[in-house]
């Protein structure tokens, strides 16, 4: 093994309290690796040594997205957090989507987009997290992370339907 690093410690009295799972996909945004886990942290990791450059306390089962300025995380309570990519300091927080069972975020043309359990896509400003709009995908509860390509946003429902949306 070349290296390994832990994003959080398994603390607590019961087995449930000790859960510290990686449920989200890693992201690579040159030259760093970004990771977030449940009951742990979000971190920027040096890929040559496995050493965290910075980390911040946040718990996520959904995931994260990265752009030049920010690391965006959907937490376990459906709050969307932006951390400055340069130093991990909080940039903004969007708390207006609680109880929506949000997907991991995706960044598209200066917007942060998350899907929810009712099939809505919520659009936020990447600059300050303010709500910009909301679209109904038409496919039902959104599963997984929306993906983008050539100006289109693609989402998949829990029932297997796929929709394409131009933002």
Predicted features and spans:
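WD40 beta-propeller blade core
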Residues: 1, 43, 81-82, 122, ...
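C-terminal hydrophobic structural anchor segments
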Residues: 102-126
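Blade-level signature of beta-propeller repeat domains, shared across WD40, Kelch, NHL, RCC1
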Residues: 137, 141-167
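Short coil/turn segments within WD40 beta-propeller repeats
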Residues: 40, 78-79, 118-120, 160
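Extracytoplasmic beta-rich repeat domains
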Residues: 2-28, 53-67, 92-109, 131-149
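Short loop/turn segments that connect beta-strands within beta-propeller blades
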Residues: 46-49, 84-87, 125-129, 167
């Amino acid at each position: 093994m070349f290296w390994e690093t832990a994003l959080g410690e398994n603390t607590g009295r019961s087995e449930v309290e000790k859960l510290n799972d990686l449920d989200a996909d890693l992201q690579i945004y040159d030259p760093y690796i970004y990771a977030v886990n449940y009951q742990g942290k979000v971190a920027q990791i040096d890929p040559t040594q496995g050493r965290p450059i910075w980390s911040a306390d946040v718990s996520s089962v959904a995931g994260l997205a990265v752009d030049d300025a920010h690391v965006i995380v959907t937490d376990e309570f459906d709050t969307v957090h932006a951390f400055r990519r340069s130093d991990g300091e909080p940039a903004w927080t969007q708390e207006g989507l609680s109880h929506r069972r949000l997907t991991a975020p995706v960044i598209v043309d200066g917007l942060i987009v998350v899907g929810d359990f009712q099939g809505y896509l919520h659009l936020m400003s990447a600059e300050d997290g303010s709500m910009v709009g909301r679209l109904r995908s038409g496919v039902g509860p959104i599963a997984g992370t929306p993906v983008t390509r050539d100006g289109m946003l693609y989402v998949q429902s829990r029932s297997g339907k796929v929709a394409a949306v131009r933002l």
